[in-house]
C-alpha cells in the first residue's frame, strides 16, 4: 500500500509539474464562467433552452437514463455514460493541435447554466435546481474538470512532440494520464453515479 501511495504521489506530481496543473487550473477557472454564460444565454434567449431540452431528453433516453429504469440499472447506466465521456475526452487528446477536450468542458458547464435558467423561468426555484445537481455534482463536476484537463494536457504533450520537442515522452504522459484516470477520476465517477441514483432523488423529494 505504501509503495502504491508513493507511486501515485510521484506520478501525479510529475504530471502536475509537466503541465497538467496548468490545464486543470485553467479548466477550473473557465468552468464557472461558462456556467454563467449558459445561464445568461438561456435567460435572454429561452427558445435556445427549449431546443436544448429536446436534445437532452433524446440523449437521456438513448443512454438508458429514463426515470422508468430500475435503480441498479440507472446507477450502472449513469456510470457507463460518464465513463464513456471521460474516456473519449482523454482519447481526443491524442489528436495534436485540436484540443478537442475543450468541447465537453464547454458544453457541459454551459448546459448546467442553461438548465438552471430554464428551471427558474419555468417557475422552479434556483435552490431546488441546485439540490438536484449538487449532491452528485460535488463528485461529477470535479471529475469533469479533471478528465477534460487530462485530455488537454495529453494534446499539449502530443503537439509538443509533433513540433519536435524530443524531451516529451508520450508513453510517460500516457502513464500519467492513465494513473489519474484509474485512481482519481474513476472513483469520483463511481461516487457520482451512486449519489445521483440513491441520494439526489430523495433530497429532491424532500424539497418538491
Residue ranges and their predicted role:
Residues 8-25, 89, 166-174:
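Cytosolic juxtamembrane amphipathic/interface segments immediately preceding
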Residues 18-53:
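N-terminal signal-anchor transmembrane alpha helix
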Residues 43, 47, 93-117:
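Transmembrane alpha-helix/helix-exit interface in multi-pass inner-membrane proteins
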Residues 49-69, 111-132:
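Membrane-interface interhelical connector segments
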Residues 64-92:
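Interfacial helix-start motif at the membrane-water boundary
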Residues 119-137, 193-208:
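Interfacial helix-loop-helix junctions of multi-pass membrane proteins
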Residues 134-151, 155-157:
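A structural-propensity feature for long, helix-poor, extended segments
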Residues 149-208:
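Terminal transmembrane helical module of multi-pass membrane proteins
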Amino acid at each position: 500500500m505504501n509503495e502504491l501511495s508513493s507511486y501515485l504521489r510521484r506520478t501525479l506530481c510529475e504530471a502536475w509539474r509537466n503541465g497538467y496543473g496548468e490545464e486543470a487550473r485553467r479548466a477550473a477557472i473557465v468552468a464557472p464562467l461558462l456556467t454563467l454564460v449558459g445561464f445568461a444565454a438561456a435567460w435572454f434567449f429561452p427558445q435556445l433552452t427549449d431546443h436544448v431540452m429536446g436534445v437532452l431528453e433524446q440523449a437521456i433516453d438513448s443512454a438508458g437514463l429514463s426515470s422508468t429504469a430500475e435503480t441498479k440499472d440507472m446507477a450502472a447506466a449513469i456510470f457507463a455514460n460518464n465513463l464513456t465521456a471521460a474516456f473519449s475526452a482523454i482519447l481526443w487528446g491524442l489528436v495534436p493541435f485540436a484540443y478537442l477536450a475543450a468541447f465537453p468542458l464547454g458544453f457541459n458547464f454551459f448546459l448546467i447554466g442553461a438548465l438552471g435558467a430554464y428551471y427558474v423561468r419555468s417557475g422552479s426555484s434556483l435552490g431546488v435546481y441546485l439540490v438536484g445537481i449538487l449532491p452528485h455534482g460535488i463528485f461529477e463536476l470535479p471529475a469533469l474538470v479533471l478528465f477534460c484537463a487530462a485530455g488537454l494536457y495529453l494534446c499539449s504533450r502530443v503537439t509538443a512532440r509533433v513540433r519536435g520537442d524530443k524531451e516529451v515522452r508520450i508513453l510517460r504522459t500516457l502513464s500519467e494520464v492513465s494513473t489519474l484516470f484509474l485512481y482519481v477520476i474513476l472513483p469520483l465517477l463511481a461516487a457520482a453515479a451512486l449519489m445521483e441514483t440513491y441520494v439526489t432523488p430523495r433530497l429532491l423529494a424532500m424539497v418538491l
